[in-house]
UniProtKB/Swiss-Prot annotation:
Disulfide bonds, paired cysteine numbers: none
Upper classification of the organism: Bacteria, Pseudomonadati, Pseudomonadota, Gammaproteobacteria, Vibrionales
TM stretches of this protein: none
Organism the protein comes from: Vibrio cholerae serotype O1 (strain ATCC 39315 / El Tor Inaba N16961)
Record's function text: Catalyzes the removal of elemental sulfur and selenium atoms from L-cysteine, L-cystine, L-selenocysteine, and L-selenocystine to produce L-alanine.
PANTHER family documented for this protein: CYSTEINE DESULFURASE, CYSTEINE DESULFURASE 1, CHLOROPLASTIC
Name the UniProt record assigns to this protein: Probable cysteine desulfurase
EC number: 2.8.1.7
GO molecular function annotation: cysteine desulfurase activity; pyridoxal phosphate binding
Amino acid sequence: MMLNLDAIRAQFPALQQIVNGNPLVYLDSAATTQKPQCVIDAISHYYSQHNANVHRGSHSLTAQATSQFEGAREQVAQFIGAPSSKNIIWTRGATEALNLIAQSYARSTLQAGDEILVSETEHHANIVPWQMVAEQTGAKVVKIPMTTTGEFGLAAFRQLLSPRCKIVALAHITNVTGTRQPIEAVIQAAHQQGAIVVIDGAQGIVHETVDVRALDADFYVFSGHKLYAPAGIGVLYGKTALLEAMPPWHGGGKMVEKVSFDGTTFTGLPGKFEAGTPNVAGAIALATAIDWYQSLDRAAVEAHLHQLQQQAYQAISQIDDIRVLGYQPNASVLSLVMDGVHHQDLATLLDQQGIAVRAGHHCAHPLMDAFGVKGTVRISFGVYNSAEEVERLIAAIHKAVDLL
């Protein structure tokens, strides 16, 4: 089924604006996606019609809010193939979900000398929490080197894997190059050694249909804001036995059965990990975003994104002094380096022409160090981008190169 791109673009009010005298070309969707009107409306409708604290009180508004909130949890469970909504923990995003796993599961199970294997290609959110818990427990974070082309070092991983390894952490799809990592092979090998696997799905959830049971993933996390949903809402999926054995990491209301000065008993899943008032509007809007995204032909969306990436890559490859780091065909990301030019300068010149890209290290210092660069200009496509926008990008790059 072909995508009706005009109809899709019309649903995104942010794309209708003028930036620096030019129509906005938004090419930063790997950082955060723009939001369709239905998601914006879902937030507005909640606050104008159903605003109430969930799981508390007996009035109609709280009953309506709770129904929508828990309905959203059920929808997320179905979206990723989880066995139950009890396996879905609401968080502020993938970063908080990874920290929850580190401070609850890892801190309560790791011992001195244990190892946590982490890919060199990871976002800082999937490195720093493991370093912190390693310091707390005496465990050791071990780097899985990437290949020279920026791919997951599967051979190196197999050599590093040993009975000392208790946790393996890697992204489903990397955020700098768009590399799809071999999570199935990693999960299988890790499980054979008795290790659990944590998958950062912040990028992967957008581009693949995820079935956590088919993957046999122990933990899978993602953020709503990269999936056309609002910022501030995220998801932690965990296997039931793991979640049940994990201690709460935050204390407060909602996550308790009984509180007294003699001691406190905690509620079961998922509530014991959700202390305090949750982001009700964010959860409801995430469910709306999932509905919206599933209404599209996902295969057609990915084909469209790959076509845009290929169009851009072919044109950029012809430009002297610009190179693409770790190019991955059939992705939706390109990371560029211009010899002798700071990435921020190139991005600024593009912004002056209405082209929004990301410049920096993309929260991936180890990957940048491995490539021998300080940062890149990252171009990342969303469902709303067009071939005409790629043409504008290329023209803007040529103009920037002439100025630099």
